[in-house]
């Protein structure tokens, strides 16, 4: 059986890890980095770039570079968070036929899980390159406060990427696993404060020794799925735009290219201000007007940044209070505080956490990698590599159904340990009612309409009877991924109706299958593209080496031989302009045969001159053999030019 990998699918960055023996190993990507930007770009010539390559070209291609798509996953277009996002991002967000928020790129409509799947494919390939074997199974993390639709959409993204998602686990829980696995055995209560690129979570977790097992039990969780580092960046960007407007009288907000450059610089400035007291945002030629080009040069102090984001930091404290209250604990009961997510590197955030919990947060957990490490540990538990670890997670929000008068009746309260089941008997509201609509809701509000609608279904053919007489049993069943199944049964007839809750919109099975096929086709396309580039590079090397040999040997090459070589050269150059790999390889072989004797002569000439083996002959010989490895590197540069 292949390895199950652990993936932290983040808003800003993603990370992949795998168990090696009793330790989780974070895997470096092809660029040598341990985290990968969660960015996907679609270039003019149809190429899809993921990660650092996509981030590098964002400035020149803002409308077709998708970032922070996790904030859209599993969301309806009408949701206030989506409406807010539309104003902040340069790419187009539109309302899909099913009411979800989708994106449109180069006239192609795409669902957020499709975009996230591209990032997951990159993480999958990173793991496969390292392990040297195919990977088909993964544990993927989500913010603890993700609702059912968002979890289902994340599972869909995994499926589209060619991964069987063995488990969806909550990010703070994963971080606690990473922190607690190698700690001394014994009972402790930890608070995980997770402020990432797009989401905020806080979980109160008890780590205990139970019958020889290391048990991680989530006592309570809370959060905000639309609060993170991206919002901190936006506060700084807004400030810089205003300052520039005051100085130059130009509003940069209507210029996507300028805004993309500004986004990049604001993020860098924010990071720099975590370790220095002030920094310069220096952007020459940011824009131009009739009087000529304009440059931005604005000093930003740490104090200024802190004042801009103070309200955002304050917003993280309320969920901490609620989580503690729900866990039935006070601040003094917490033994350790763990910081997760890149935004927790900001000193002001650390101070706020320290002031609230009354203790220094732990510094021995890598905020960028802890979640992926925890996911890999959970993957190890599922794969049987990690023994004696038990993870007890909770459902973040209450679940129930709409009852008479538009009220939400809760069947499962928030912070209930999962997996779990709950059953309740309801009846009809009218005489001779023969059907009951079960409207499933998630949230904490009393009014049904104020909660998230997860879906609805009908139980029909109830025998006519006075109101209140029929007995309809509704059962909720939440699995270990936090995903809900609901069934309703008429106790008189035994007739039952059940559904796996998909978002009231969500992707249908057919849509997911279509996206899986698209992704597979894209993988084949990528492979063909790499093979074509490798063939081109090998041909290019041979052309260069042959021309060098011809020049070096001069008149020593007979006219007939020279003509044959030049003809083969010309044919190969022509083939290289096209996209036919087989044609390029055939012409390369023809040139190699025609120019084969040149290498020997150059070698003999150099030996006679005392320079054995160096120069064009050696170069040509190697070009005729194998240049595929070099081609990998050249291909990347080639596409970025």
From Swiss-Prot:
Tagged with keyword ATP-binding: yes
Ranges of Low complexity composition bias in the record: 617-626
Region of interest (Disordered), residue spans: 577-641
Acidic residues composition bias: residue spans: 627-641
Gene3D superfamilies the UniProt entry points to: 1.20.1270.10, 3.30.420.40, Actin, Chain A, domain 4, Substrate Binding Domain Of DNAk, Chain A, domain 1
GO molecular function, one term: unfolded protein binding
Induction of synthesis: By stress conditions e.g. heat shock.
Pfam families (alphabetical): HSP70
PANTHER family tied to this protein: HEAT SHOCK PROTEIN 70KDA (PTHR19375)
Family per similarity comment: Belongs to the heat shock protein 70 family.
Function field: Acts as a chaperone.
Listed name of the protein: Chaperone protein DnaK
Source species of the chain: Thioalkalivibrio sulfidiphilus (strain HL-EbGR7)
